[in-house]
Amino acid sequence: MKTIHVSVVTPDGPVYEDDVEMVSVKAKSGELGILPGHIPLVAPLEISAARLKKGGKTQYIAFSGGFLEVRPDNVTILAQAAERAEDIDVLRAKARKSGRTPLQSQQDDIDFKRAELALKRAMNRLSVAEMK
Protein backbone atom coordinates (compact mmCIF):
# COMPACT_ATOMS: atom_id res chain seq x y z
CA MET A 1 0.00 0.00 0.00
CA LYS A 2 1.20 3.54 -0.74
CA THR A 3 2.36 5.71 2.13
CA ILE A 4 2.85 9.39 2.85
CA HIS A 5 5.61 10.80 5.07
CA VAL A 6 4.36 12.62 8.20
CA SER A 7 6.30 15.03 10.41
CA VAL A 8 4.89 16.60 13.58
CA VAL A 9 7.10 19.46 14.71
CA THR A 10 7.00 21.82 17.71
CA PRO A 11 9.32 24.68 18.73
CA ASP A 12 11.07 22.09 20.96
CA GLY A 13 11.78 19.80 18.03
CA PRO A 14 10.23 16.86 16.17
CA VAL A 15 7.59 14.78 17.98
CA TYR A 16 6.80 12.23 15.27
CA GLU A 17 8.23 11.22 11.92
CA ASP A 18 7.19 8.17 9.91
CA ASP A 19 5.50 6.94 6.74
CA VAL A 20 1.77 6.22 7.17
CA GLU A 21 -1.14 5.15 4.98
CA MET A 22 -3.56 7.88 6.10
CA VAL A 23 -3.65 11.02 8.24
CA SER A 24 -6.83 12.44 9.79
CA VAL A 25 -6.90 15.84 11.52
CA LYS A 26 -9.46 18.41 12.60
CA ALA A 27 -8.92 21.70 10.78
CA LYS A 28 -10.79 24.94 11.50
CA SER A 29 -12.89 24.17 8.39
CA GLY A 30 -13.69 20.59 9.46
CA GLU A 31 -12.27 17.06 9.46
CA LEU A 32 -9.58 16.28 6.86
CA GLY A 33 -8.47 12.86 5.68
CA ILE A 34 -5.18 12.82 3.77
CA LEU A 35 -3.95 9.96 1.61
CA PRO A 36 -0.77 9.67 -0.50
CA GLY A 37 -0.99 11.90 -3.59
CA HIS A 38 -3.27 14.48 -1.91
CA ILE A 39 -3.32 17.92 -3.54
CA PRO A 40 -1.22 20.62 -1.85
CA LEU A 41 -3.01 22.29 1.05
CA VAL A 42 -2.35 24.53 4.04
CA ALA A 43 -4.90 24.65 6.86
CA PRO A 44 -5.11 25.99 10.43
CA LEU A 45 -5.79 23.24 12.99
CA GLU A 46 -8.09 23.03 16.01
CA ILE A 47 -6.97 21.74 19.42
CA SER A 48 -7.44 18.06 18.66
CA ALA A 49 -5.66 14.83 17.76
CA ALA A 50 -4.06 13.53 14.60
CA ARG A 51 -4.94 9.95 13.74
CA LEU A 52 -2.16 8.19 11.84
CA LYS A 53 -3.03 4.84 10.25
CA LYS A 54 -0.30 2.37 9.40
CA GLY A 55 -0.44 -1.39 8.97
CA GLY A 56 -3.97 -1.71 10.36
CA LYS A 57 -3.05 0.18 13.53
CA THR A 58 -3.87 3.76 14.50
CA GLN A 59 -1.54 6.06 16.43
CA TYR A 60 -2.77 9.27 18.06
CA ILE A 61 -0.97 12.54 18.65
CA ALA A 62 -2.54 15.35 20.69
CA PHE A 63 -1.69 18.87 19.61
CA SER A 64 -2.76 22.33 20.69
CA GLY A 65 -3.70 23.83 17.36
CA GLY A 66 -1.20 24.86 14.73
CA PHE A 67 -0.97 24.45 10.98
CA LEU A 68 -1.08 21.58 8.53
CA GLU A 69 0.92 21.60 5.30
CA VAL A 70 0.12 18.89 2.77
CA ARG A 71 2.14 17.99 -0.31
CA PRO A 72 1.56 14.94 -2.52
CA ASP A 73 4.34 12.98 -0.78
CA ASN A 74 4.45 14.46 2.74
CA VAL A 75 2.43 16.05 5.53
CA THR A 76 3.84 18.46 8.09
CA ILE A 77 2.00 19.46 11.26
CA LEU A 78 3.45 22.55 12.94
CA ALA A 79 2.10 22.84 16.49
CA GLN A 80 2.91 24.89 19.57
CA ALA A 81 2.73 21.66 21.60
CA ALA A 82 2.23 18.01 20.61
CA GLU A 83 2.41 14.69 22.45
CA ARG A 84 2.11 11.08 21.38
CA ALA A 85 -0.60 9.16 23.27
CA GLU A 86 1.97 7.03 25.11
CA ASP A 87 3.92 10.12 26.24
CA ILE A 88 1.01 11.99 27.85
CA ASP A 89 1.24 12.49 31.62
CA VAL A 90 -2.35 11.57 32.52
CA LEU A 91 -2.08 12.85 36.13
CA ARG A 92 -0.93 16.28 34.92
CA ALA A 93 -3.70 16.42 32.31
CA LYS A 94 -6.31 15.45 34.94
CA ALA A 95 -5.02 18.18 37.25
CA ARG A 96 -5.55 20.70 34.45
CA LYS A 97 -9.00 19.30 33.72
CA SER A 98 -10.03 19.68 37.37
CA GLY A 99 -9.24 23.40 37.02
CA ARG A 100 -12.77 23.87 35.68
CA THR A 101 -14.04 25.67 38.77
CA PRO A 102 -12.07 28.89 38.21
CA LEU A 103 -13.52 28.90 34.71
CA GLN A 104 -17.03 29.27 36.10
CA SER A 105 -16.21 32.06 38.53
CA GLN A 106 -13.89 34.23 36.40
CA GLN A 107 -15.14 37.69 35.47
CA ASP A 108 -12.20 38.75 33.35
CA ASP A 109 -12.57 37.78 29.66
CA ILE A 110 -8.84 37.25 29.14
CA ASP A 111 -8.50 34.92 32.12
CA PHE A 112 -11.67 33.10 31.06
CA LYS A 113 -10.35 32.55 27.53
CA ARG A 114 -6.99 31.31 28.85
CA ALA A 115 -8.72 28.94 31.27
CA GLU A 116 -11.03 27.72 28.52
CA LEU A 117 -8.09 26.99 26.18
CA ALA A 118 -6.17 25.23 28.97
CA LEU A 119 -9.25 23.09 29.64
CA LYS A 120 -9.60 22.21 25.93
CA ARG A 121 -5.92 21.23 25.76
CA ALA A 122 -6.21 19.07 28.90
CA MET A 123 -9.38 17.35 27.70
CA ASN A 124 -7.77 16.70 24.29
CA ARG A 125 -4.66 15.21 25.92
CA LEU A 126 -6.80 12.95 28.14
CA SER A 127 -8.90 11.70 25.24
CA VAL A 128 -5.77 10.91 23.22
CA ALA A 129 -4.09 9.22 26.21
CA GLU A 130 -7.12 6.94 26.57
CA MET A 131 -6.70 5.81 22.93
CA LYS A 132 -3.31 4.14 23.54
Swiss-Prot record:
Its main location: membrane. Keywords: ATP synthesis, Cell membrane, CF(1), Hydrogen ion transport, Ion transport, Membrane, Transport. Coiled coil: none annotated. It is found in: Cell membrane. GO terms for molecular function: ATP binding; proton-transporting ATP synthase activity, rotational mechanism. CDD domains: F1-ATPase_delta. One of its GO terms (cellular component) is proton-transporting ATP synthase complex. It is a peripheral membrane protein. Belongs to the ATPase epsilon chain family. F-type ATPases have 2 components, CF(1) - the catalytic core - and CF(0) - the membrane proton channel. CF(1) has five subunits: alpha(3), beta(3), gamma(1), delta(1), epsilon(1). CF(0) has three main subunits: a, b and c. Produces ATP from ADP in the presence of a proton gradient across the membrane. This is ATP synthase epsilon chain. It comes from Geobacillus stearothermophilus. The gene is atpC.
